[in-house]
Amino acid sequence: MAKAPKKNDSSNFSKFIKWFWILFASGFFIICLVFLLASWGFLGEMPTFERLENPQTNLATEIISSDGKTLGKFYLDDNRTPVSYDELPANLVNALVATEDERYFEHSGIDARGTLRAIVFLGAKGGASTISQQLSKLLFTKRISGGVAGRIVQKVKEWVIAIRLERQYTKEEIIAWYLNTYDFINNADGIRSASRIYFGKEPKDLRTEESAVLVGMLKNSSLYNPLRREELVLNRRNTVLGQMAKYDFISEKEKDSLQELKMDINFTPESHRDGLATYFRMYLQGFLNDWIDKNPKPAAEGERDRWNIYLDGLKVYTTVDYRMQKNAEEAVKEHMIRLQKEFFHQNTPERNSTAPFLELNPEETNRIMERAMKNSERWRIMKANGKSDKEIRASFTEKTEMTVFDWNSETEEKDTIMTPLDSIRYYKTFLRAAMMSMEPQTGHVKAWVGGLNYKHFQYDNVIQGARQAGSTFKPFVYAAAIDQLRLSPCDSLPDSQYCIEAGKHGNPEPWCPKNADGKFSGSMYTLKRALANSVNSVTAQLIDRVGPKPVVAIAKDLGIKGEILEVPSIALGTPDLNVYEMVGAYGTFVNQGVFVKPVMVTRIEDKNGTVLYEYVPETKDVLSKEVAYAMVNLMEGVTQGGSGTRLRHSSNIDQTVYKEIITGYPYEFTNPIAGKTGTTQNQSDGWFMGMVPNLVTGVWVGGEDRATHFKTITYGQGASMALPIWALYMKSNYADEELGISMAEFPEPEELTISVDCSKETEESIEKDKLDDDLDDDLDDLDF
């Protein structure tokens, strides 16, 4: 009787073993079936091999300077610029592996030990997601499924995708891909943006404790936000450092030392409207959109069929030099702050009841304000929302809180309360500026400053704005005369009243221009001396002899696109031109008569480095080498004995105007410089075009409206408003020898039959002009 239970126990054990294997096999079969179904797409869409090869990740377009630095980006929601594994520091990779997946380099996408641990301890001792699984979730299964069953299916899909990723990519590629994809919030998409935004540096320059902060954010970037939860982020950083020590990536001593460090966040937000070269970047936006319209995208499966500058991760290689751009922006800011201060001083309500406008009656002032009001964003929005003109006008007289531009603030902004109409008048009191700098031999634009502050002044005065050129147009007249009439810089003409009769050259009535000071010396002036001092009577004689038509033809060949009437008055600079055109044109003189179209973009690549666009230079032979050199020689006279002499002398340091607005004076340049100042009617525009052998730079300063200007020529001339910006910019350029800005003589042609070596008497007269220029407070600079 005692043996019966043993038989029963044996039978029960056999049944247990049988059912165990049945259940095990069934479970294994179900698991395999689930994986197969997931792999075949029956549990929801799975990425194809093509999508795994070319995932549609939104990438920002990066704008790269000629010296390899990032000028800015174009993006919508994802400010992401990928980096390769080689660009990641070892401490960042080590922190990632130690914290997120310690056996990363040992498994094939799924960590069996980690998965078993997570099941046994229900996740209490850490999750089981590998880096590859986390990447698959970021790329293909972002949405968290509801319910237990849904979550299980999603997890299975992540496992399948992770295995596929491991088969198609190296471990290093997956790490880079993961870090490039993760959203670190605060507009920091991917490791490069995160590194730049939180620490102001490239990923390769991250210190160990900084890498630990970013890796700590991978657990939950919203929770571990360095800008809002510093203590929580600090604790998380120290946890990451502890993991690194646990897995021998750093020593215990180093861990303890790093954990003692305070948080050192250097928040540097990135925005389309902030940073360096904002106006240039906005120009590029239009350039790229035009390029996209003409170049269809060869779309792969699942991709867009049109290039998108905000999503496709293009790399745009530009000609702008980061250092020179910085020098240019600093020069504009430094001078415009001082110039604006004086302009405010001269336009107080007590001194000018119609400020910022001069010499306008109330009706003319109202017309300007009315036009500005109707062109404002506020008017357009309210009109689009169905508001009546009466309602809109009423809103412009209601005080409201606003943030406006302010030179006196470190952020160039201040909060205030004023009516929208008052804000329009306030902004019109600011003088505007534009500057472009170009290598004449290549056409490469090295610096581009379209205004004071793009956020508040979005009109680009380099290429959008066209203003009267004043005396900076005169070199085109001189070039035509030397080219067509075979004159030389040493030929002389009298400074006396000169009239072109009615009916000649299309004149409806006699044209008898005056010199800027209203006087005629009666003396003979060489062309060099006449251009240096902007003698209008000599220029009038030249355009009469050569005719307006050849002058216009040369200007067009030099790249001027705007309308130029074929009438004599153009000789004194009445045409409206922009800085972009003027720099390109003047570059021809330095480049031995060959016009090179200014270029801003040399190459465009896709996210994989495939070249999509490469610039082909556009050139045109316009002038002979002799004529071009003669023109450069003429304009050297401007800085030797004319309106540009303040670049060289230091004798006026105690004069009031020099103290107030000639920023940075004395400059004391000793190297060869060719240039031309320009001032238009009523001092509405001030120009300076400056040239050295390998750099041509144009500067314009003026009000938004021509009625916004200085009252006197002393302050309102090109030599006061624009020339100091050029001088400050070049001083900074010369201080950086790596830029290689030339201080040499302008190259002379091998054969030169045009006389440029004027007599000793002529040179003495130039020196006399220079002395008179200093004593008379640059009265000879009047160059309408």
State where each predicted segment sits.
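Bacterial peptidoglycan biogenesis and beta-lactam-recognition machinery
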Residues: 38, 98-111, 122-127, 165-171, ...
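N-terminal type II signal-anchor transmembrane helix
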Residues: 1-64, 339
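Peptidoglycan glycan-strand catalytic modules in the bacterial/periplasmic cell-wall system
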Residues: 13-14, 58-60, 64-257, 264, ...
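Residue-level preference for non-acidic, small/hydrophobic
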Residues: 33, 68, 96, 135, ...
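Conserved catalytic neighborhood of penicillin-recognizing serine enzymes
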Residues: 121-145, 204, 268-280, 487-551, ...
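Active-site loop and adjoining helix of the penicillin-binding protein/serine DD-peptidase-beta-lactamase fold
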Residues: 158, 162, 166, 218-236, ...
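A penicillin-recognizing enzyme superfamily signal
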Residues: 322-338, 371-439, 444, 448, ...
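Non-catalytic structural connector segments
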Residues: 251-319, 323-387
